Amino acid sequence: MLLSEVLQVLRGAGKVGAAFTSTQGEQLRLMACNSTFGAGMKAAAEAVEGVMGTVMGGGDMTSKTDEFAGIEKWEEMDLDEAAKWSVASEMPPDFSSKDGRGETSETPVGAATGTIKGAGWPAQNTRFLHVSASQHHFRFVHDSIVARLSPEDIQRAREAKQNIARPVRQKLNERAKERKVPATRISRLANFGGLAVGLGIGAIAEVAKQSFGGKRSEVGALLDSPLLSEANAERIVNTLCKVRGAALKIGQMLSIQDNSFINPQLQKIFERVRQSADFMPAWQMHKVLEEELGSGWREKLSSIEEKPFAAASIGQVHHGVLPGGKEIAMKIQYPGVAESIHSDINNLMSVLKMSVVLPDGLFADSSLEVLQRELAWECDYEREAKCAKRFRNLLKGDPVFVVPEVFDELSARRVITMELVNGVPLDRCVDLDQETRNEICFNILQLCLRELFEFRFMQTDPNWSNFFYNSEQNKIFLLDFGACRDYPELFTDHYIEVVHAASVGDRATVLKKSKDLKFLTGFEAKAFEDAHVEAVMILGEAFASAEAFDFGTQSTTQRIQSLIPVMLRHRLTPPPEESYSLHRKMAGSFLICSKLKARFSCRNMFLDVYNAYKRQQQERRSQV
């Protein structure tokens, strides 16, 4: 009897010892992965477990399985969830190791996150056991975790953390579909007609939902309307992604506004428009290449991928390789887009006028005239190639910005080929450290000022995907030069004085120079003059103080929005033609800084540009 009780006690002690060995051995392994003595510690831990396992006779471990319910599902893991776990805290959310090199893969924003097999990490519905070092009570997970996580994996994770935005190859958004581009005006009109009918039905449903207890958006956005409900926004996006061209370009412009301009539900859906349109089938792409480059176009390439890695409003981009091995990006324009600019904009405006009432002070006709001219520029790839070469020459030797090389032998009116660049668009840089984000945004804003006041030649499309950041080289690659334009000297002479006056609080000079620029006729109501000057002063705040300006917390957009109703009500003349593209670019640059939550002083940046401009101005006048 006594002997049997002793044996039971010993058996129980054996189980306790085995469990203790397992948990403490697990701790040793995790410590080993982070230690310079990793290999030796790992071997020691394995030896201890081997000896203890023999002594304890392979104790019953069923309690371990019971304790970690659902352990058989741990082979599948959501990559984003892994980043939240203690051991994986050194990994960026999109880190994966495929071939031992620790390469990263880019997942398009909004794409569904897949599962990773064999990663050995718990699934999302599994909670990690807390570790309390102060109580000396350690509990860890199953052996398979450490078995799949070597010291080399940890080192690669640490390196990846320092290069969250390391260069990766672009991928087409998973939402994009292969669909023939409607190339004739009649086929494009049919799509817009179907959209108008769908919007009407959707608006009736939205009004009914609001009338019977549905909640109306509380955001007082300018484009907030029952006709622009989320369901109707889906209809708009699907149509724009199908027809592409000028209509899609307008949708992409809306996507980079903040929710002070459009309601947040629409903004999320228009974000899909910005990221990727549908792409044309291979036969349609081949037809364009043959018409532009001739029947022997394939002989100029070593290879080309049939499916594009990016699809935008006017064209899609394919990866290719030259006979010498150089990688290229070939942008191919959708058929019928250039010929349909005027009709597309008229069709879209007809739909938009159903949705919102456009105030007279918006001068929509003037805006559309400027927009049509700019879209015609963007459809001329020969013009874009010249602009890209001009920018490449202006920024030659620049320590930050790089313009890819253009290959003339593979470029024409509807095809432009440039060298392939590696990096990530700026909206993927939000997780970089504060110092790096500040540096990126400082350079972007400084370039904006240099383009206007030094080059008097600006790339006016502020789409975040037109700026690719390469963390390994610490360079920003500039892409898409279709929207480039010159600014006359007389315009910049007055405009720089407006910005300078705003930075020093000189309201009288702001008003005078605004009249010189034809923003005002001189016959406007006092309310309009005050609102205009106040809007300019708000925009000048970033350049007014020597202290760091916090773009992430500023309320610039909201404050200007409060002035818009007054300006639209009392405006007597459309703004100067140059201001449309200029203000789009400047607003986009500020939004980049806001999205990346940058903090830096802008005053000296502007003063350097201003003083250099005044010196050049004096030199020009002395020569005359």
Curated annotation (Swiss-Prot):
Query: How does the protein associate with the membrane?
Result: Single-pass membrane protein
Subcellular location field = Mitochondrion membrane; Cytoplasm, Cytosol; Cell membrane
Enzyme's top EC category? transferase
Q: Where is the active site?
A: D461
**Where is region (Disordered) located?**
90-117
Specify the Protein kinase domain's residue ranges.
285-517
What pathway does this protein act in?
Answer: Cofactor biosynthesis; ubiquinone biosynthesis
Q: Which GO terms describe its cellular component?
A: cytosol; mitochondrial membrane; plasma membrane
Q: Which residues cross the membrane?
A: 189-205
InterPro entries to which the protein is assigned, alphabetical: ABC1_dom (IPR004147), ADCK3_dom (IPR034646), Atypical_kinase_ADCK (IPR051409), Kinase-like_dom_sf (IPR011009)
SS bond partners: none
Residue positions binding ATP: S313, K331, M418, E419, L420, V421, N466, D480
Q: Where is this motif: KxGQ motif?
A: 249-252
Query: Pfam families in the record, alphabetically?
Result: ABC1
Q: What is its EC number?
A: 2.7.-.-
Task: State the UniProt keywords alphabetically.
Answer: ATP-binding, Cell membrane, Cytoplasm, Kinase, Membrane, Mitochondrion, Nucleotide-binding, Transferase, Transmembrane, Transmembrane helix
Q: Which CDD domains match?
A: ABC1_ADCK3
**MF terms in GO:** ATP binding; protein kinase activity
Q: What happens when the gene is disrupted?
A: Morpholino knockdown of the protein causes nephrosis phenotype of periorbital edema and total body edema in 54% of embryos at 120 hpf. The glomerular structures are altered, with podocyte foot process effacement and disorganization, rarefaction of slit membranes, and disorganization of the glomerular basement membranes.
What does the entry's free-text domain comment contain? Adopts an atypical protein kinase-like fold: while it adopts a core fold similar to that of well-characterized protein kinase-like domains. The KxGQ motif completely occludes the typical substrate binding pocket. Nucleotide-binding opens the substrate binding pocket and flips the active site from inside the hydrophobic core into a catalytically competent, solvent-exposed posture.
Quaternary state and interactors: Homodimer; homodimerizes via its transmembrane region. Interacts with the multi-subunit COQ enzyme complex.
Q: What is the protein named?
A: Atypical kinase COQ8B, mitochondrial
